[in-house]
Amino acid sequence: MRLQYKTTTKYLFFSLPFYLMLFACGLQITDVEYALREAGENRGELEAVLSHYAKLDDRQKLEAAQYLIRYMPYHTSYDKGIEDYYHAIDSVVALSEDKLEQEKHIESLRLRFESKYKQKRDIEVITSEFLIQSIDEAFKQWRECEWAEHLDFEQFCEYLLPYKCFEGQPLTEWRNAYYDICKGDIDLAYLCDEYKRNPIFAATEVNNQMKNTPQSFGLLKTLPIYDPDIILKLPFSNCATYCLGAVLIMRSKGIPVAYDFTPNWSTGNNGHSWNTVYTTRFGNLEFAPHTTDPGTVHYPYLKVPKIFRNVYKPNEEYLKIATEKYIPPKLRNMFIRDVTAEYMPTIDIRIPLQESLKSGQSPFIAIYDGNNWTPVYWGKIAGSHVVFERMGLNTCYIALAYDSNGNAIPI
């Protein structure tokens, strides 16, 4: 995580910001020119995508292409060498049904393949053919698939449009590759008025198929895995990995599913991840893949200070902090959106500053995890106060400032 953070920060420091006004089919695309310059020698591939949709006179597809390109400079992906690691795991699982034996060999593979995991900036390697195909497939899901037709354009851009679901995911044709995994009878939903156009049915049907795969929760040390077929074969894994697999499986079918998480429970030393499906009437309904279905309240007896959703668009507040100041390791993820208020009543916590923060210091709010004070969100300076927005209730907090070396100072 620290290495990835430094790399991202380097790009933010040395890519000088500028604003150039361009118009394509009457659309203002200021930030797109910044992205095109960041593409370097790959600029022609991205311009080909914009030109393609401008000639088609499809305003929405052109806007979608601009959306993806605008934020692409911040994204990186593993190259296809990652697939050798997947094949090795598949071979290990096929050789033995003993989960402990599988664990031993899978963890040994991590050390063997770690040096082969190479990340590249999407903006520098993505091809026009791949991006056009991905955009067209996403629009087909939105315009023709019953599970997604209730999404507006902004929601479509968040749930279905992105050419990948997670940071690091290789640039592959994942929708077609994963469509048949755990699909159950969703293709027959058109036969029943209660099921067609019902994303709750679709997510539940797929989740029921996932429940039929033998999953166990535990600590298995692996390199990042973005292939749900491999995830389903692991002897055991954690909630984050299973939720990642669920997003890939369900979005490949046009089901608007997201990955939500809390960095830390209010009274515990761990965070947690789960999924949500965006419904036609009830907004987002959470569920745990392999375990519970949409509409089942997830851990209602546990308090959370903050809940985030994994998204494609980088968090602007995060970027402002990351370019100049220290961010604690647990919060080093720019691709998040605060959705705490979707789950519970929240409060803006306003704390007076006894003295101004020094240059390079940034405010964070933390909870006690039983051992240490763990930061869960950043704050904003408002005059002589610091404000922490949309915080969960019934939680004990402390306000901290971090200097550039990562030292915490109570405010």
Functional labels for PLM-detected ranges:
Residues S356-N372:
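Short, ordered, surface-exposed loop/turn motifs in non-cytosolic proteins
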Residues N405-I411:
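Edge beta-strands of extracellular beta-sandwich domains
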Residues A48, R59-L234:
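Secondary-structure boundary elements
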Residues H385-N405:
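Short Pro-Gly-centered beta-turn/loop motif in secreted/extracellular proteins
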Residues I347-E355:
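A short, amphipathic beta-strand motif
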Residues D31-E33, A54-K55, A189-Q209, G218-D229, ...:
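Hydrophobic/aromatic-rich core segments of domains that either
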Residues N371-H385:
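Short, acidic Ser/Thr/Gly-rich low-complexity loop/linker segments typical of extracellular
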